[in-house]
């Protein structure tokens, strides 16, 4: 996805997303199924709040290196069996034990958001693509929220902070090699990816869809460049 096109950074597709998507399609069970060889704790595994995580980090406490489990988007997608949104949240600790959105993922997403804003402030990246992607996901989430009914696509907070939205918006779609070159083009590009992410998450077969949405968006990049450059010249 990258070396084939040389070292001049002219690869049409985001190489990281191509690698991830190829691995996911080729070995779906291997990278999505985690089998614990033994119980990590004597009691039922509990989610840690922020204070407990910081206490474990900065105190000399013996704990497992990591705990694996379903993401918030996976829990929501496969628990939405005719239940109201409030019922899904009450029945799953990943939601009910959260500080304000989703246990664990909320702080990860906020960290990516802070890092992304820093990149914009320091002008490492521009605001166009991230704002368009986040805005389109937020708009569709509000449009199809349906007051939390059993047919709801999930809240805007779930879609913004429950998956890889912030990572994708600030650190992946801003790849200069595979994204449009003009500001208007980047807005169109980010909007397309945001719409695709929401469609695949809600009606597709994958709970998160950043990689596939970005690759599909990369297909449109040459056309976006052509259209926006012609508009700029005219």
Residue ranges and their predicted role:
Residues 130-133, 138-183:
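A beta-strand-loop signature enriched in Asp, Gly, Thr, and Trp
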Residues 29-36, 144-150, 154-155, 196-208:
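Hydrophobic alpha-helical transmembrane segments in multi-pass integral membrane proteins
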Residues 200-234:
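Cytosolic-side transmembrane-helix boundaries in multi-pass membrane proteins
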Residues 90-91, 102-112, 129-131, 162-163, ...:
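Short hydrophobic alpha-helical membrane-embedded segments
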Residues 9-113:
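Long hydrophobic alpha-helical segments that form multi-pass transmembrane helix bundles
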Residues 21-28, 109-120, 133-142, 167-172, ...:
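Hydrophobic core segments of alpha-helical transmembrane domains in multi-pass membrane transport
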Residues 12-16, 157-165, 186, 204-215:
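Loop-to-transmembrane alpha-helix initiation sites
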Residues 1-9, 114-124, 170-179:
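C-terminal ends of transmembrane helices
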């Amino acid at each position: 996805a990258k070396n084939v096109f040389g070292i001049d950074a002219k690869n049409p597709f985001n190489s990281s997303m191509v690698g991830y998507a190829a691995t996911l399609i080729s070995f779906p069970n291997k990278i999505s199924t985690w089998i614990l060889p033994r119980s990590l704790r004597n009691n039922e595994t509990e989610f840690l709040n922020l204070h407990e995580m910081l206490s474990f980090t900065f105190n000399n406490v013996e704990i497992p290196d990591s705990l694996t489990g379903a993401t918030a988007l996976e829990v929501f997608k496969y628990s939405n069996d005719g239940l109201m949104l409030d019922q899904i949240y009450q029945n799953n600790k990943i939601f009910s034990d959260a500080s304000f959105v989703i246990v664990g993922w909320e702080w990860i997403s906020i960290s990516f958001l802070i890092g992304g804003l820093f990149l914009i402030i320091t002008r490492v990246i521009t605001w166009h693509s991230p704002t368009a992607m986040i805005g389109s996901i937020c708009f569709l989430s509000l449009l199809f929220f349906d007051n939390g009914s059993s047919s709801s696509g999930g809240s805007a907070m779930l879609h913004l902070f429950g998956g890889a939205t912030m990572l994708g918006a600030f650190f992946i779609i801003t790849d200069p090699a595979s994204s449009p070159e003009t500001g208007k083009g980047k807005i169109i590009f980010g909007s397309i990816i945001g719409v695709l992410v929401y469609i695949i998450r809600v009606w597709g077969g994958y709970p998160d869809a950043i990689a596939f949405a970005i690759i599909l968006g990369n297909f449109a990049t040459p056309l976006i460049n052509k259209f926006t450059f012609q508009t700029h010249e005219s």
